[in-house]
Amino acid sequence: LLHGTKLREVLLNSWEGVHFDISETSMVDMTRDFAALGGEMFVVDDGWFGDKYPRNGATTSLGDWMIAPSKLPNGIRPLINLAHNNGMKFGIWIEPEMVNTTSELYEKHPDWVLRHPDFEPTYGRGKTQLLLDLTNPKVQDHVFKVVDDLMTQYPDIYYIKWDNNMSMSNTHSQYLPAELLSNLYVDFTLALEKILKRIRAKYPDVVIQLCASGGGRLNYGFMPYFQEMWTSDQTDAYHRILIQWGALNFYPSNMLAAHVGSAYSKYTQRLIPIKFRFDVASMCRLGMEMVPSKLNDAEREYAKRAIAENKNIRPVVQQGELYRRVSPYEGKKDFSSL
């Protein structure tokens, strides 16, 4: 695991709080409010990019990795500075292997995607998403450039969330010759590894989280290139007990990200007390995923105490030896002991 002995920061991710509704005002407020809770990093998730096609939903903009002036008219520099001025680090979301058909990139390079030219492709998220053909060296350069441009312009970006919300549903390369198409899966994976090695050669220290519609890429092969992985999009704490118990059979706790969501789970329509949410998320790398200003006074005070306590115990949680005592798969499903 890359940087496996380094303690992980407590962060706030914007996704479940505002989804695509990114604005300078909302990001400033979330940064300040999280700093007041003792947070250590703020991450701007999906929704910050797209010039011709601003990212207001899942149907557009992937591939156009320029800041949307309609959303962040002053760019992300003020947000980075604000985070630093509040004693925090800054992170940002990208999905560099993907493109939407409604994007400037697709308009310029429709031949860069995996699809057969004679058949309607299978689309991913938003019914316009396609997977870029990483076997094409020009696409490899593009994916590297997504990271390189961000880090060149904003070298003090500390953290990148690298997402991947579509599997290889269209198994045809417009770049490879016909006799090599049977090896597409292998060649694609080797091309991705080549890109990651290139990124790590230039940016060995930037923290990169690997996400794939949750934990779709949770595997050992990516560990040398990523410091952490998003365990699951399911943030309901009751379900997370089961998910994290299983994942901790194979992966260290400092590699698995676990976030405290809102009291009301959009996935299960269940109300969950804040203490239970923090207890479960503290089993791994603790984070939050909500609008902090929506906490009431009692919840806000509890969150401050829980974050402070996590900083005290995380050397044990993230670097200690794990002993399994009570499995949530035996008897009660909302209880485990580690």
PLM feature segments, named:
Residues 21, 102-103, 219-220, 331-335:
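Short, solvent-exposed polar/charged micro-motifs at secondary-structure junctions
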